[in-house]
Amino acid sequence: MPQSTAQLKSPLLHTLLENLTQSSICTSTAIWHVPNPVNFVCNHNENSFDNKNNSVTTITTTDVSTNNHKNTNYDYEQQEQWSNEEINSNQESNEIYTMTFLKLNNAANRVAMNLANYLERKWSSITNKINRTQLNQHSLSIDEPIELRNQSDTVIALFMPPGIDRIVVQIACMKLHLAYMPLDRNVPAGRITQILHKLKPILILIDKDYYDFIYDDDHNDNDKMSDLSSSIDNNNKSLLSRKLSSNDFIIGNLNQLKLTFQLFDVKVYEYIKLMKLSKYYSRSDIYTASIPIRVCLFPFESDPIVLVLFTSGSTSSGPKPVKLRTTQLFNRLEWQWDSTSDMDLPNFENATCNSNTSVKRIGLAKTAWGFVDAFTELFSCLLAGIPVVVPGGSACPSEKSITDVQQLINLTKHFKISHITTVPTQMNLWLKQLRLKPKEIVTSHLSSLRTVIVSGDIVHPKMACEFFQLFKNPEMRLINLYGTTEVAGDVTGLVFRGEIDVKKHTKVVPCGLERENNKSGKPVLSVGTVIQGTAIFIVQDDDDHHLHHEKDNENQPDKWSNPSLSIIGSVDRKPNWDKFPFKILPKGHIGHVCILGQQVSDSASRCQRIESLPEDLNCVDTNKCKSDVESCENNSSKEIRVFMPGDLGFIDPQTNHLYICGRTNELIKINGIRFHANDIDNLFIELKKNWKAKNMTNCTREELLVNKVSETVTLTIQTVHGRDLKLVCFYVLHMNENQNTMNIEPKENYDKLEDLPKQDDFIAVFSHYLPPYLSPTFINIDHIPLMRTSGKVDKEYLRQYYYSKHHCEISEITKVLQPGWVNDPVKHMTENNNSTSDQSFGKNSRDFKLSRGRERARKVLAEVLGIRGPNGDVIPGRPKDDEDFYLLGGDSLLTVLTTEQLRQLGFNVNLDVFTKTGKIGSILTSLQNTESDFLKTQEPFTSDSWTVKEISMNKVLKKSHTCNLINRIPLMEDECYLSPTICPQGSYEIFIEQWNDGNFSVTERHEIVDVLVNAFIEKDRLSHALKLDRTDLTEAIEVFLNAHKSNPGIVLTARYYYENPYEHTFVKNKLVGVIISLPAKHVPSLHLTPKLALVQRFFDECSNKDQFQDISMDNLLATQMVAITSQSPYSKSKYLQYMLSNWKKISLKLLTRLERDLLRIAAKQGYSGVITFNTNEVTEEVCSQLGYKVIQTTMLKSFMNKENLLLLPQYERIRCSYMIKELNPSS
């Protein structure tokens, strides 16, 4: 740790740099910036680092002269000269910019004061902060903050390339206590738009090169840069606008980015940099170590937010903000600087044991700054007085500069770089490339390298050993770190000094985690011990035990003192174990990693707070900053932050080291066996190692073929319905391994080459190690895609690639599937017991036609459910007769699509087929018995009386005996009653009643509102397209319900009732369905809100009165809203978990029953017809089967065009069908 930090009273990061300006290294170089590292060539002598070479252009940035009294504008002119040197550079191949620690601090002071001056002009719109000149009159002991706006909500966005300017702004923001959010042009434009809308920064500071490129088409005369026209030579054009294309600059739609920027305050950084100093500030303030307190935006914020990063994580798709505070970042850096730890870097002038040369500590800052590793990589050096090399510029992102290992060699050789930070995938690529070069070149050119820090993913022990086989220098260290963005980067770490350390800290975990056969396992490498002020637990899998305590653990009041439990590290306060929601596993057991303590960001999406005990814990860590403890006591003295990063791991009982096994979202459980996707990749490595040991002799043909595989990535692939369906292994052959692996679309190898492994070859090999149900699908691609910025394997990209090539796309699920295979011959399905071969009957026989029709119908079901093989074709014989349509992902929408496709094949089918049963065999049998003709026209409903069967269990009717009972629906299929082991005794039924008939009803008004609002918010696409919120929907429903007071219509409710004496429960009931109708002549208009008024205009357009003057509204009933809850009412019953999917079928049956009962009651009350507006495919299909006729269909897109309103593409296919059903009213 830097010696200067010992005198700190608070861990404010910028004070570390300010202390360095008072030390002997203040005039030493802090930054070397190489704008064009791709073409950088190292030509100078290895032993003369400080010698200048003619091929190297070194530009030392000019600082403002301290003699500022000669010319009041001299300060401004010098800053202008500095800016011109950087902006107008032609970026020769070996151009280098440098800046010392003192000049870096002065430049940050200047930018901080200019930025504060600019924000002062608009401060009234940000906060009601008092005048800066009055700030000195206030006591510094004020405890309450002056600002009415929270510091954590005041964020500035920075859109700048790598370089000195970017670092200056970062430090300036720290001095102002102003949180900054980095924007990277390697992030897609759409995601940047999401981020900006979510965080709403007060200012977007953009680099001039970026600005010129984005707005070059809008103003060639550079009108928007008029503020700089007098100070910047307009004849010089930026390198970016000359060398970059739109696709090179940013991913996605550049116009979308322009539209987003128009919503925010956007300023060019050079404008802020070259502003004249405010009259409230003195130029002498620039050259002091710190800026005056009156300049600081939030001077009394003791633990300000420094950095805001966005991460998508592994459990959701949207961007999630993570706000990192000073104490978190300082604690992480202090951990690395600790001189008593192996984490500390070598001394600044550390003479190596086997060399006569001294090695300086020089870092490489190459990580994309949208990742937390970029912060620790850069400021762990700068704030400790260690210089850094920053590659990349406007035309070359920093991470792109080191993709080729030769560029890394050139930079390391020239600058004598001593340590670098990387990710495992990137390091693996480097090792492959370095092995192709002569060892002498690698040894001599990388002789200064001493430390390689690896983080961000799991490091395989084999790769760690290969690293030390290549770098045999005894001073070389490999540091394996573990952490996430939510914990400020890293929380554990371990230093390896050779292969012996790697083998010592490698453990073998059984494949599948629970398999009894331990012969085949995967090796995992330790990630070491935990950072100070933080603890790590290994807790129970909630899928098995619901994370509850067991009785044997409840008897132990202090689990921390139990050495057998999976707990390492320490926190300031003990958790209240009675409130702790997890069961802690014994050491050596694999479970979920759980992180507690001050390193956890309070903005983490999966962070929760638990109660702590008041007494302090006797922590092992004693080297704590006092302000950390005070901050913890002031902010959350009674709570501890707990974070679940989504990783699986265990703690070694002997060493107390943490081992990470994989991700929870890559874990599947089949037949009671948990299996991790990475187990397939590790099994590949172990098998190839065994084959190599026996020199490929006595190997089978399949083993010889599989040995050609170079790399693999195995993932759990989900269906479009969200179920983990299978394991998919993407593999690359040896012939493809040298191809570029950056994130470009992988291509499958369709070449008809001989002796390439096939699916059967893989299965033949893996069947000896894996059960059949765990065998993955193998797909050969030409390379493994990597993420552009982090260098990690782009797993989400592979998943989307699989969906597009081998699976039914999500966007395609709402389209009508065209049966192009209608006339294809039907193949014999040997695995299906119900299929019959063509040889069994004559081709003209009725049985043959029925069998062929059955298999065509099966193919339709497979298409709709997305059941496809690895080649994208429908799997023969699937779905099987004993499978369930709803368990395979079927729902009400898919039943409509299936019905439509079956009708195109000539089947006389309606939704009743899917409401009676979900079994595939039963559905196919019902279809076999249908005739190939059109649906018969249904007769109008009459008011004939209908009877209700006697109900066996009178207890169920305790609360419904006064209701006007219309119908009842049992919640179980007939086959369930035949099996006492499947269906427990009890009563599970739905009763439909008329809510507004004047009789007593147990259904309350608020229940109707809640069911309708929740259903429309969740499933109604029209509400989504028009952006209706809960307030809009609630007001619309209340309007319809209020109309019943003067002009009553018909409101039907469906309630679920349940009683089981074996569960000792009372009668339970819940509202599960509602339909509201009103007399058509008295339907109120919706004009309460602008969005409801838009809905009203749309429906008016659908029922244009000029076109339907012959339809009289006098005796018509109009259906307004209908909804069925999507959540099963019996989902909490411990006996009925197997019936959850059955609710999809029941809900469709209930919807049909509600619509049918409405028609019956309407006919009985004398209505001549019922009209309805259907914007949902399911309700439209139900109404069609009940005899409704379509009067008019209106597309939402055409309506929105008339209104001059934008409509998102995913909603363009929404239509409204205006339908009518004629009735025969009773006399």
UniProtKB/Swiss-Prot annotation:
GO terms for molecular function: beta-alanyl amine synthase activity. Keywords: Ligase, Phosphopantetheine, Phosphoprotein. It catalyses: tryptamine + beta-alanine + ATP = beta-alanyl-tryptamine + AMP + diphosphate + H(+); beta-alanine + ATP + H(+) = beta-alanyl-5'-AMP + diphosphate; beta-alanyl-5'-AMP + holo-[peptidyl-carrier protein] = beta-alanyl-[peptidyl-carrier protein] + AMP + H(+); beta-alanyl-[peptidyl-carrier protein] + tryptamine = beta-alanyl-tryptamine + holo-[peptidyl-carrier protein] + H(+). In virgin and paired males, bilaterally expressed in some cells in the head. During pairing, expressed throughout the ventral side of the body probably in ciliated neurons. Highly expressed in virgin females in cells throughout the body and only weakly expressed in sexually mature females. In virgin females, expressed in some cells in the head and on the dorsal surface and lateral edges of body. Pfam families: AMP-binding, PP-binding. Its EC number is 6.3.2.-. Residues 1-850 are annotated as: Adenylation. The modification O-(pantetheine 4'-phosphoryl)serine is found at residue 892. Disruption phenotype: RNAi-mediated knockdown in males, severely impairs vitellaria and ovary development in females resulting in a severe reduction in egg production. Also, production of beta-alanyl-tryptamine (BATT) is impaired. Induction: Induced in male within 24 hours of pairing and levels rapidly diminish within 12 hours of becoming separated from the female. The keyword Ligase applies. Residues 851-931 form the Carrier domain. Belongs to the NRP synthetase family. This is Beta-alanyl-bioamine nonribosomal peptide synthetase. It comes from Schistosoma mansoni. The lineage of its organism: Eukaryota, Metazoa, Spiralia, Lophotrochozoa, Platyhelminthes. The gene is NRPS.
